[in-house]
Amino acid sequence: YCKEAAERGIENVQILSPFREKGEAASEQLNRAIRERVNPFRSAEEEVKIGNRTFRVHDRVMQTKNTEKVSNGDLGFITGITTDSKGERLVQMDFGGDRKLTYTPEQLAHVDLAYATTIHKAMGSEFETVIIPIVKAHTIMLYRNLLYTAVTRAKKKVILVGHKPILFMAVHRADISKRNTMLGERIRLYCKAYHTERNALPELQQAG
């Protein structure tokens, strides 16, 4: 993730996980781990704690509830954190265009970190690079149609990180949808394109 984000920009790289909470490769756990790498603690003035959650200036975030100016699933960045005359912490966010908003602590209940998100939350969105963890803990959710949704969020590059047997299981697993039967061919074509560009067959990065 760090390498791709440095090359393409954080806004163009997205980790997509089948689960939000289950396992070390779930989106919530990945968000905390990735954030410590790309946006570590600098000062107390540049972060705010809401319950057991922490937000920092420069964090990548997602809106999780529709409002007048932003929709559920919209992505943005925290651009500043201030304190008003009553001592309340206020968080400035930029969702692109003229959507520069200030959030109270109560409104942050509808905001999540978004370095990683669930595949479901990413439906309808596209990113230059998509990184997908393929691990045993996600087996129960890894059907062909879900993997297809994740792979097709990528405009330029897909990185699969994990275990090949789990990937093959997901590609061939019985599916309730008929429209995703070309997933195996799509992954093969990604591999062929990668091979042509790098002159070497790609290997799945082995999970540590």
Regions found by a protein language model. Name each.
Residues 74-208:
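C-terminal accessory regions
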Residues 1-72:
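Conserved helicase/translocase motor-coupling segment
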